[in-house]
A protein has these predicted regions:
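Histidine/acidic-residue-rich, glycine-tolerant segments that coordinate divalent metal ions
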Residues: 2-7, 13-14, 32-150, 160
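Internal helix-loop-helix
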Residues: 7-8, 23
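Cytochrome P450 catalytic-core helices
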Residues: 16-21, 25, 56
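Flexible, small-residue-rich helix->loop connector segments that border functional cores
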Residues: 21-36
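A common structural junction motif
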Residues: 125-126, 175-185
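A conserved active-site cap/scaffold subdomain adjacent to cofactor or substrate pockets
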Residues: 146-176, 189, 195, 200
Length: 201
């Protein structure tokens, strides 16, 4: 799940190799000490966006495990005491009404205006959320030339914090920014949850 154009910026290309090597080392240690048991190595796809382990857990893949070990590349070798953030990834899809931007813009309802107003609202929201809340966004799709009032726009948001409750609150407030922007522009908004995960320590 490399990032588009950038590639494996945080070492995801190493995950499978490292997990397999750890399993081999653990097997050798267990055999040398006469410890019986079964070691499994799972590939966990789509970690970057879809949080693949959540889907696997929901489907019972890990139900019969006594323990699980996971790892992530870092700039030094250590046992992590970090708090891994609770995160929501959402798409905000705005639908408007297309019109010619020069001849009859008053007939249009700009989905792009709605997306921009939403993002402005979120940027003003940053001062009024706890310090560990992060709200990242990108314009994901507009697909219209500049001389057409766009009837479609999509933004993608990552909303994170160190506690699930704070992420829930921030996500609700971002949703409200989207709904308010749609109301202001006479458009509609569809909120699509891409993935969600809890904090972990």
């Amino acid at each position: 799940d490399a990032l588009p154009e950038l590639g494996h910026a945080c070492g995801h290309n190493l995950l499978g190799t490292g997990a397999a090597a750890a399993a081999c080392a653990l097997k050798a240690d267990m055999e040398s000490r006469g410890i019986h048991g079964t070691i499994r190595v799972y590939g966990c796809p789509a970690e970057e966006i879809m949080s693949g382990k959540i889907v696997m857990n929901d489907r019972g893949v890990f139900n019969d495990l006594d323990t699980a070990v996971t790892w992530h590349p870092f700039d030094r070798n250590r046992v992590s005491n970090d708090i891994w953030q609770a995160q929501d990834i959402n798409n905000y899809i705005f639908h408007g009404l297309s019109a010619h931007a020069s001849r009859s813009p008053e007939d249009g309802r700009s989905a792009l205006d709605a997306a921009e107003l939403m993002n402005i609202g979120v940027n003003y929201l940053r001062e009024h959320v706890p310090g560990d809340v992060r709200m990242h966004y990108a314009y994901a799709d507009n697909g219209q030339p500049a001389n057409v009032v766009p009837d479609y726009a999509r933004t993608n948001y990552f909303i994170r914090s160190s506690r699930r409750s704070r992420t829930d609150d921030a996500s609700l407030r971002v949703d409200n920014c989207a709904k308010g922007a749609a109301l202001m522009t006479g458009t509609s908004v569809e909120i699509e949850l891409v993935s969600s995960c809890k904090d972990m320590k």
